[in-house]
Amino acid sequence: MPRIETRNMDLTTEYFVGTCTHVNESEEADACGKRRVSWFRNMYEKGLRVKVALLGEKPIGFLYAMPIEVCPWGPLGKDLLAVPCLFVLNEQKGKGAGSALIAEAEKEARRQGKKGIATMGYYHDFWFMPAGFFEKCGFSAMGKSREVTSEGEKEYLSKEAILWKVFDSSAEPPEFLKPNYQFEPISGKIVVDLFFNVFCGTSNGEAQRVREVVAEFGDSVVLNEYSADDPAILRRYQLPRGIFINGKEIGWGYEAPRDGIRKAISQALYKD
């Protein structure tokens, strides 16, 4: 019986990782995957590592690890390794892949001389980054949890917490992102403010949809893009993902559908 192994992402697994497991699903997923893989490669020198779990030669899960200073998802901190996302195929859960990936992340953190590992965990029944799993792996919730308020995400996620595992007692606690968005109107225009990052497949994919839909409206709509992949942008606005139309946030949790984006812009135009 094949056993679970872990490796760094390579040419044989980058398609699985880049498409967030949506292999051979659509041209859109493939295009998104290419953008993400390019970003992964560019970030390698800054400490990004993608760990892949395999059963035999079949990839079944992955984990992203990077210095917290360059992580586009939060939390904010220093001298820690951030794990913004860990995923294991549903049919392969409970077999040790997730724990094996966490063990690799710990090795990577020590290899890079970090004082610990930090992640965002959620207390809910949804699959994304369950806090209970990280606690079973030895992570501790730092301070109090807080309610998820982002439009769309709050439909799936309830309370979020910063969880960390410390190797060095001098490690400084990371901090929650605190969104700092202020709408700036432009006379006679509908303004779309897009906060996104290339790292997250969901954010990456919906950002491209927003660009395409906004282009349909020509000069009537102004698009402002804010990429959380730039640490300075993330620290200024502290929003890794969000779509605002004339200051009002829209969201679905999953990738914003084109029809939904189009309808929201049309309603704003009609209102004005």
Where are these regions (language model features)?
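A short helix-loop-beta-strand connector motif used in the catalytic cores of GNAT acetyltransferases and
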Residues: 40-52, 61, 82, 235-238
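C-terminal "cap" of GNAT-fold acetyltransferases
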Residues: 147-181
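Conserved acetyl-CoA binding element of GNAT-fold acetyltransferases
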Residues: 74-90
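Conserved acetyl-CoA-binding loop-helix of GNAT-fold acetyltransferases
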Residues: 88, 94-109
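Short amphipathic alpha-helix that is part of the acyltransferase structural core
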Residues: 1-55, 181, 200-201, 206-212
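Conserved GNAT acetyl-CoA-binding A-motif
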Residues: 109-123
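Non-catalytic, surface beta->alpha helical segment in thiol-disulfide oxidoreductase systems
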Residues: 247-272
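Conserved catalytic-core motifs of GNAT/GCN5-like acyltransferases
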Residues: 120-121, 135-159, 250
